[in-house]
């Protein structure tokens, strides 16, 4: 789509984006090094498959990220890339979110199962709603489970979670194997779903397809 993108892995001690995207073998520096004064370029790794997508791995140990250092870092990288995505771990600790700035969009990702939806509702209830444009991405979506009423329908998931829907990502073999293949085939349903989400983020009006086509 022609946009430069930076992915920042915030999951201290349990980083995974470098492995999922195939740059783990290159990693020498990570986010903690940058926050402690190293040049941003030292800890930034570009995907071989797309020169516009870059990743900064999370610190290898817990406790290296502070609100002050993250705030300064966030302000700087926002001027360097068209899109910056901070990938936070699951949980209700929002202490670092405010360091990124109130102009940030917030995306909660949940599966359609009842436990995950309830967790999303807890996140929504705890999030300072006045500060964030908050949306929901439903991951591992399976239309068959909805049809058979094993899981709640999409409207119920939205109502229970409390978030506005941004998009649906279907259960996909490509996504399951991402840590091995590091890519998603362009003609797959998963790729098309992620592309729809990206277009919406850029301000396009993109309708949700019929459920069985997701």
Where are these regions (language model features)?
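Inter-motif core of Ras-like GTPase G domains
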Residues: 79, 91-114
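Short beta-strand "acidic-cap" motif of Rossmann-like dinucleotide-binding folds
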Residues: 4-9, 85
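P-loop/Walker-type NTP enzyme "switch/lid" segment
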Residues: 7-79, 173-181
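NTP-binding/hydrolysis catalytic cores, primarily Walker-type P-loop NTPases
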Residues: 178-214
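Beta-strand-loop-alpha "switch" segments that mediate conformational coupling across diverse proteins
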Residues: 156-186, 194
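G-domain G4 guanine-recognition motif of GTPases
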Residues: 111-112, 135-148, 168-175
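Conserved C-terminal guanine-recognition region of P-loop GTPase G domains, centered on the G4
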Residues: 118-131
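Conserved beta-strand segments of the P-loop GTPase G domain that flank and frequently precede/overlap
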Residues: 56-58, 87, 107-111, 136-140
